[in-house]
């Protein structure tokens, strides 16, 4: 371990090395590249607050603060915020949020060569373009409750336990992991409306499963044939 990561303090007895593990040093930059490609291929982006989903005869419609848009088919892929829309469609999906925290130490990415996870304490540290990112913890806290400052403090203390003295952290952030009781996402059509599709609830794996979920949903909308069994991911499983 010392040969791989000489800056980790020698508190450990051993570890597991994932030889082919990969990580993105700047996920936002990758997503912006994909977004630019989407626009170049004719995609349109409107930034508005969705207030409701209703219907114009049999076509789904999105109501915003100022406009109403009517579609042939519609996808709800709003992560942890999807439940607010599915509830309005009379579909009670037990989506909750696993809130996770991160703390950012600017200019310290040179201290580690790769992501390191300390499973006993439930946190990890990743070298990013912007510095060291310390992440971890899980709490079911919904969308409205304030952040738990104690969890941020624990991340800072754990990072110093692993790496020694660190400068004052630059940034704190809390995110919402969209989670379901069976740890499977919801992918596929609404049980009540055949022209509304769902893609959410990917828990800790949104970055990993987002691309394949998008491919599956686009195939459904285009009515392509598939040999995939998607029943385990249907919203029907919740009654």
Regions found by a protein language model. Name each.
Residues 2, 44-46, 170:
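General small-molecule cofactor/ligand-binding pocket signal
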Residues 8, 191-239:
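C-terminal lid/capping helical subdomain adjacent to the catalytic/cofactor pocket in oxidative enzymes
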Residues 9-73:
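Helical element adjacent to the flavin cofactor pocket in flavoenzyme catalytic cores
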Residues 28, 79-80, 211:
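Alpha-helix N-cap/helix-start capping motif
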Residues 37, 41, 88, 216, ...:
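Active-site catalytic microenvironments for nucleophilic, acid-base chemistry
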Residues 46, 75, 197-199:
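Hydrophobic/aromatic beta-strand patches that form the interior of the parallel beta-sheet core
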Residues 52-55, 59, 68-195:
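Active-site substrate-recognition segment that forms the wall
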């Amino acid at each position: 371990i010392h040969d791989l990561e000489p800056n980790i303090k020698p508190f450990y007895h051993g570890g597991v090395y994932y030889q082919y593990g990969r990580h993105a040093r700047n996920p936002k930059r990758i997503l912006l590249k994909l977004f630019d490609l989407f626009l170049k291929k004719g995609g349109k982006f409107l930034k508005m607050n969705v207030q409701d989903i209703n219907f114009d005869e049999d076509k789904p419609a999105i109501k915003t603060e100022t406009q109403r848009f009517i579609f042939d088919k519609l996808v709800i892929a709003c992560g942890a915020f999807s439940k607010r829309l599915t509830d309005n469609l009379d579909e009670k999906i037990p989506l909750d949020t696993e809130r996770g925290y991160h703390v950012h130490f600017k200019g310290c990415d040179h201290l580690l060569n790769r992501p390191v996870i300390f499973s006993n304490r439930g946190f990890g540290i990743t070298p990013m373009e912007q510095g060291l990112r310390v992440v971890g913890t899980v709490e079911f806290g919904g969308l409205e409750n304030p952040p738990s400052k104690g969890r941020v403090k624990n991340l800072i203390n754990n990072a110093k336990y692993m790496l020694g003295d660190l400068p004052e952290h630059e940034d704190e952030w809390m995110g919402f992991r969209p989670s379901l009781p069976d740890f499977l996402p919801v992918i596929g059509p609404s049980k009540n409306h055949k022209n509304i599709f769902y893609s959410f609830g990917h828990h800790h794996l949104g970055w990993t499963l987002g691309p394949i979920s998008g491919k599956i949903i686009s195939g459904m909308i285009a009515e392509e044939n598939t040999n995939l069994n998607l029943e385990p991911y249907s919203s029907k499983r919740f009654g």
